[in-house]
Amino acid sequence: MHDAATSMPPQAPSTWADYLAGYRWRGQGEGCSAATVHRLEAARRPTLFVKQEVLSAHAELPAEIARLRWLHGAGIDCPQVLNETQSDGRQWLLMSAVPGDTLSALAPERLVRLVAAALRRLHDLDPAACPFDHRLERRLDTVRQRVEAGLVDEADFDDDHRGRSATELYRLLLDRRPAVEDLVVAHGDACLPNLLAEGRRFSGFIDCGRLGVADRHQDLALAARDIEAELGAAWAEAFLVEYGGDIDGERLAYFRLLDEFF
């Protein structure tokens, strides 16, 4: 549920006051990250978004800012960073809105084709040109840090893992780690709400803070999981067929397990 629209909150960066005068702020709630998101609207002016997060060792917003800038420069549709600053002990990001809406209005066949095509285009980028390393060596170290810091929400585990501890699942991650990685530029959190469409056309990726060089199964696992939950297993399989290539079922399961820690 979204909050009621308000004027610019007093804790927002004062340097934005003139530029954002007249905008109404509407809270979008919080997703899986600790960031808070507001949608900004004003008559005859472009819709904007503000994202903010408490500054900490585990904050993800600085990483998202860097990745949005790189991704926009690589020609992939995503929010454009308009300004970023630190104020009131928080990191603040002002960005453009990606046109369109979530994929929920699309017919199943169109949805799976759109998601497959969008991910193929992203994965076709040259990973050697991407400065963000999300290979398993680094990701597993991040998982270890999150487990040790008590940041993993065990109550939010999927049904397959409910009742197990984060430490237990971390050991399982280490035991089942794939021997090789099929590296691409991956979104890192390719669940359906993070892909938008305008009409029948893909319009952009959002929530790009985990983008980086990683195994393509990272994205395929989360997209297929969401498609199965929304449309059924047959459509998840159709998505993987539409994406093409040699898909490894064990690696899909592995990256779904990895996602439990974020």
Tell what function each PLM region has:
Residues H2-D3, L68:
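Phosphate/pyrophosphate-binding loops and the adjoining catalytic core of nucleotide-dependent enzymes
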Residues M8-D18, R121-G188, I247-E250:
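An alpha-helical support segment within catalytic cores of ATP-dependent transferases
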Residues Y19-Q28:
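Conserved N-terminal boundary motif of the eukaryotic protein kinase catalytic domain
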Residues Q28-R135, R146, V180:
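ATP-binding pocket architecture of kinase catalytic cores
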Residues S33-R44, L48-F49, V81, E168-Q218:
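Active-site acidic catalytic loop and adjacent metal/ATP-binding pocket
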Residues H58, V180-V185, E198-A253:
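Active-site Asp-x-Gly
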Residues R69-H72, A224, R256:
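A cross-family signal for key residues in well-ordered alpha-helices
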Residues D259-F262:
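Short hydrophobic/aromatic patches at helix-to-coil boundaries
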